[in-house]
Amino acid sequence: MSLLTEVETYVLSIVPSGPLKAEIAQRLEDVFAGKNTDLEALMEWLKTRPILSPLTKGILGFVFTLTVPSERGLQRRRFVQNALNGNGDPNNMDRAVKLYRKLKREITFHGAKEIALSYSAGALASCMGLIYNRMGAVTTEVAFGLVCATCEQIADSQHRSHRQMVTTTNPLIRHENRMVLASTTAKAMEQMAGSSEQAAEAMEVASQARQMVQAMRTIGTHPSSSAGLKDDLLENLQAYQKRMGVQMQRFK
């Protein structure tokens, strides 16, 4: 796996699924391929994106700044600086300085990532802030190692929280989660269906599913009534794709 592929993988792992994620993935691909060279426009676009947490925006801004060639005097962006200040916690800053001293002696991506993984996400973000604010300089490879370690820490905690929700025995939470998943699957089906004639059936199924979820929420239903809703939708989607000649093995 190439270095940039690895960076893209880690960064996208902390971006919530949805149309915005696909957009960010495209921007990252363009940046890494050298197709997007307007850093200022890129940062302005990033700053105004909804849904993303300030820290995710900060990390993406850091990656764009590392990758896109820019004039030396180009102003640093406040939204990135604020996100990478370790919540203003002096402990994070102390640890970030110690980490920076270690990283300065490192030259490889994997070496830097290994060192950084033993620090908390707050300290890692602060260390990125030091480098972003030009208070310290490391090689691009080392900076990318720091980025990937930070994303791994964040993705780990997101995964723990997601697993807690998936394995919860609370029927109300499970019911709501199934309805949310069915609704987002229906939305994805509508987007994929496009405007071809064969799409009418898929659109109809998706529309009915969304109406059903809406009705279930409006009148309040038994927690078990949502069981299998998303799986039924996915079966319909795969049947539609087969007719269209698309073979997608797994959507679940």
Curated annotation (Swiss-Prot):
- Gene Ontology biological process terms, A to Z: viral budding from plasma membrane
What GO CC terms are in its UniProt record?
A: host cell nucleus; membrane; virion membrane
- Where does this chain carry the motif Nuclear localization signal? 101-105
Keyword vocabulary terms for this entry: Host nucleus, Membrane, RNA-binding, Viral matrix protein, Virion
Name of a matching Pfam family: Flu_M1_C
Fetch the SMART domains from UniProt: Flu_M1_C
Subcellular localization, per the record? Virion membrane; Host nucleus
Question: What GO MF annotations does this protein's record show?
Answer: RNA binding; structural constituent of virion
Cross-referenced HAMAP family: INFV_M1
Q: Look up the further comments and give them.
A: Most abundant protein in virion. When expressed alone can form virus-like particles in transfected cells.
Q: What does this protein do?
A: Plays critical roles in virus replication, from virus entry and uncoating to assembly and budding of the virus particle. M1 binding to ribonucleocapsids (RNPs) in nucleus seems to inhibit viral transcription. Interaction of viral NEP with M1-RNP is thought to promote nuclear export of the complex, which is targeted to the virion assembly site at the apical plasma membrane in polarized epithelial cells. Interactions with NA and HA may bring M1, a non-raft-associated protein, into lipid rafts. Forms a continuous shell on the inner side of the lipid bilayer in virion, where it binds the RNP.
What protein name is recorded for this chain?
Matrix protein 1
Organism listed in the record = Influenza A virus (strain A/USA:Huston/AA/1945 H1N1)
